[in-house]
Amino acid sequence: MRRIAAKAGITPGAIYKHFSGKEDMFEEIFAESGNKLMLLSESMLQTDFTSMTDDQLLQVLYSGISIRTFELLEDDMQLFHMLLKNDSGTYLSRFRKIYIEQCTGFAMQYYSELYKRGLASNQLSEKTVYILSSSEFSMVCEIIADDSCKNGITPECKQAFLEAMNILLHGLEAALGIKKQEEPKHGKN
């Protein structure tokens, strides 16, 4: 708290007068950015995959949802960098749990619909999807926490993320038994 107060040009007492602790302060600071991500993941859960055509359903896999979400974070990069560098783990852990559960729910609904329609020949367990969602979340956090990205995502880190997401995409195609569709647009820069 002293370091944060010094950077803000105030006394630690001023912070403690307003917030009961660092976690309370982080919750207040990140409320808007966190809510933006939560609203996005909640809206994804409302997607009605049953009303989509087969082509529309397959296009979801190649739409770059994760990449667009990652780009959404760029406006708040300094805040997220500060959170990852200074949080004792409580706020981030709580956020991570909720966000990953929502992403896992979305993915399970999606993969289930692919399988029901015969567009995928295999199903993934919920535990596998949870681990994949956790891995993706960890990749994003790793990039944000990198000191080279504290003022924005560097081209090198963005390219590394795009490549990692393409590897994940092709792994999902193989694991689900989906024949390769046209090359995703987000992998070409």
Where are these regions (language model features)?
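Amphipathic alpha-helical packing segments from all-alpha helical-bundle domains
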Residues: E71-D75, G89-R117, K127-S134
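An amphipathic alpha-helix signature
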Residues: S63, I67, I100-S112, S133, ...
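Secondary-structure edge/capping motif, primarily at the C-terminal ends of alpha-helices
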Residues: M44-M52, F80-D87, L114, I143-N151, ...
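Hydrophobic alpha-helical connector segments
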Residues: E28, E42-D75
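Helix-turn-helix
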Residues: M1-D24, E28
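Short, basic, alpha-helical segments at the C-terminal edge of helix-turn-helix-like DNA-binding modules
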Residues: M1, A31-M38, E42-L45
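Hydrophobic/aromatic-rich alpha-helical bundle segments in the mid-to-C-terminal region
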Residues: L114-I167, A175-N189
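C-terminal/domain-terminus segments
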Residues: L83-I100, E156-A175
